[in-house]
Amino acid sequence: MLLISNPRHLGHPMSPGNWKRLIILLSCVFGGAEMNQQHNNPHQPMTLTWQVLSQTGSVVWEKKAVEPPWTWWPSLEPDVCALVAGLESWDIPELTASASQQARPPDSNYEHAYNQITWGTLGCSYPRARTRIARSQFYVCPRDGRSLSEARRCGGLESLYCKEWGCETAGTAYWQPRSSWDLITVGQGHPTGTCERTGWCNPLKIEFTEPGKRFRNWLQGRTWGLRFYVTGHPGVQLTIRLVITSPPPVVVGPDPVLAEQGPPRKIPFLPRVPVPTLSPPASPIPTVQASPPAPSTPSPTTGDRLFGLVQGAFLALNATNPEATESCWLCLALGPPYYEGIATPGQVTYASTDSQCRWGGKGKLTLTEVSGLGLCIGKVPPTHQHLCNLTIPLNASHTHKYLLPSNRSWWACNSGLTPCLSTSVFNQSNDFCIQIQLVPRIYYHPDGTLLQAYESPHSRNKREPVSLTLAVLLGLGVAAGIGTGSTALIKGPIDLQQGLTSLQIAMDTDLRALQDSISKLEDSLTSLSEVVLQNRRGLDLLFLKEGGLCAALKEECCFYVDHSGAVRDSMRRLKERLDKRQLEHQKNLSWYEGWFNRSPWLTTLLSALAGPLLLLLLLLTLGPCVINKLVQFINDRVSAVRILVLRHKYQTLDNEDNL
C-alpha cells in the first residue's frame, strides 16, 4: 500500500532514485519467501512436496519425499475431474476436489445429465461423461515463459492461453504439439479403476523436461491451460509448484533473532554439604535422603557459545603446548573471518543414508580463508588447485548416496560449508569441494601485551603486538616429524585429538547458532539484515566487553587464560594484574621519583606556582639588559634632534666673506 500525504504530489513524476527504491522494496517483498530456500545447504535432505493446484487455487494432488533439493522429479498424476471441481463452466460446480472422486455425486442434475447423454458433452458427474473425457484429445498452452508479443497473441485466462493455433506446447492431439523450451510434457495417465466405480478415471501424466529440471523458480509456481479438442474446446487451468520445508526451530521470546543474546550465565555457587561425623548407628537400617532433582539446562546464550569457543581452544592448546597456556590471552576478533579452514587429507567413506551426517547448518557460511594441502573432489578451478594434494572422482550409486569426510572434518564447497556430500546433487563437471578442518579465528597474545596496552593507552607503540592464530599454535605445538598446519590436526597425538573434541563441539554449537540467526534474519523483511549480518558477532562481543567479561585490545575481545582454564571475569583479572604490577613498579622507584605518588596535592601546588615563578625569574634575568638598551636608544634620538635644531638657527659662513 502506498500512502500519499498531499494530493498535489500526484502530478509530479517519480524520480529515478525513488523508482529504484520501490523496485528494491518490491523485490525484497516478493523474493523473501524464495530467498530462504535458495540459500539452504544443497546436500542436506529436505521435505520436497510437489503440488498441483486447480483454477480455484485448491491443492488437488501432491506428492512428498525426503531428498536433497532439485534432485527429485516425479511424475505428477492429477485427475481431470479433480481439476474442474468447483468451476461454473463444468457440471460439478458445487463439489470439491475430494468429493469429485465419488462415482455418482449426490444431488445430481438429471436434466444436465440427459443433455450429456444426448449431445455427448464432456463432464464429471456421470460415468458416461467421464468416459468421453478419456476418449478425447487435449492440448496444453503455457502462461509463463513467453515473450510479450507471444503473450498478447495467445491470450489470457479467458482463452486458457490458447487463443491462436501455435500456442500449444504439449498434449495428446493428433498433430503432437511439442516445444523445446517448455518445462513439462503432459499426456494421459493410467487409471486405477473404471469410470463406473470411481470419479477419478482420467489421470494426467505430467513429466519434467530437461529445461524444467534446470529451472529453479518452482517455488513460485508455473501455470498452464489445458483444452480438449472437441466442440467448444472446454478446458481448465492448472498450476504446478514445489514446497520445500524443514522442521521449524523453536523460539521463545518476542524477538526470534535476539532472544538468545546475552552474556554468559554466572555459574551458581553450590555450597558444600557438610559430611556428618561417624557415630555408632542407633538402628540397623540407615536413613537415605533422596537427592534433589537436577535443574533443567537452559539453551546456551551467545556469551556461553563464545566462551565455549575460548575454553575449547584452551583445552586444545594446553594438550599440545602447556607452556603457552601458563599465562596468556585468547582473543576473539570483532570482524570477520570468524573461522578458517585448513585443507586436510584423510580417508572418506560412502553411506547409503544421511544418519551419520551432522545436519546442523544450512550451508550459508562461506570460508574466506582456507590454507593447507588436502583432499579435493570435483573440478577444482586453477585458483584453488594449490590446496589439493589429491583429487578423487565421486562414485554415485544407490549404496553411495552420501560422502562423509574423515574424523570431524567438513566439506568446503563452492555452494557453502556442509558436513556431507550428496552424490545426486554434486555435479563433477561444475562443482568442487575441499576436505577441511575447521578452526575458530582466535588470536593468542602473551600476558604482557595487554598489560602494556592498558598501562600506556595513549602512547604510540613502536612495534605492533605479534598475533598468532590458533591454527598456527596447534601446528607448532606438535612434535617435530609429525608436521605442522593441517597435518598436525589430522595426524597429531592422542592428546591433541582429545583436546580438539571439546573445541569441535563448541564450534558445532556456534555454527548452528550463526546459521539459524541468518535464517531468521532472512525471514524478517523489516530488519536491516545486511547490517546485522555483518555486526552480529561484534554485538555479541560488545555484550561481553561491556559486562567486564573480556578485555578489549583494538578490535579484539580477549580472555585471560592460565592452567586452570579461561577466566570468565577477565576484565577484573586484568585490573588486578595491573594494580599488582603498579605496586611492584612503585617499590622499585627511588625516594625522589616517588614524591608525586606519595603526595597527590604536590602535583597541583607545583603546577600552580611554577608558571609565576618562571616568569619572575625571566624578568629578573633579562630585565636590566632590556632597560639599558632602551635608555641608550632614547638618548641617541634626543641628541640627533638637538643637532637638527641648532643647524636650523645658525648659518655657516664662507671663508672669503670672513676675510
Swiss-Prot record:
Specific enzymatic cleavages in vivo yield mature proteins. Envelope glycoproteins are synthesized as an inactive precursor that is N-glycosylated and processed likely by host cell furin or by a furin-like protease in the Golgi to yield the mature SU and TM proteins. The cleavage site between SU and TM requires the minimal sequence [KR]-X-[KR]-R. The R-peptide is released from the C-terminus of the cytoplasmic tail of the TM protein upon particle formation as a result of proteolytic cleavage by the viral protease. Cleavage of this peptide is required for TM to become fusogenic. It comes from the Viruses. Disulfide bonds join C141-C162, C154-C167, C328-C331, C328-C558, C550-C557. A motif (YXXL motif) lies at residues 650-653. Residues 36-606 are extracellular. GO terms for cellular component: host cell plasma membrane; membrane; viral envelope; virion membrane. InterPro entries: FMuLV_rcpt-bd (IPR008981), TLV/ENV_coat_polyprotein (IPR018154). Residues 466-486 are annotated as: Fusion peptide. Koala retrovirus is both a circulating virus and an endogenous retrovirus of koala, except in some isolated populations in south Australia. The 17 amino acids long immunosuppressive region is present in many retroviral envelope proteins. Synthetic peptides derived from this relatively conserved sequence inhibit immune function in vitro and in vivo. The surface protein (SU) attaches the virus to the host cell by binding to its receptor. This interaction triggers the refolding of the transmembrane protein (TM) and is thought to activate its fusogenic potential by unmasking its fusion peptide. Fusion occurs at the host cell plasma membrane. The transmembrane protein (TM) acts as a class I viral fusion protein. Under the current model, the protein has at least 3 conformational states: pre-fusion native state, pre-hairpin intermediate state, and post-fusion hairpin state. During viral and target cell membrane fusion, the coiled coil regions (heptad repeats) assume a trimer-of-hairpins structure, positioning the fusion peptide in close proximity to the C-terminal region of the ectodomain. The formation of this structure appears to drive apposition and subsequent fusion of viral and target cell membranes. This is Envelope glycoprotein.
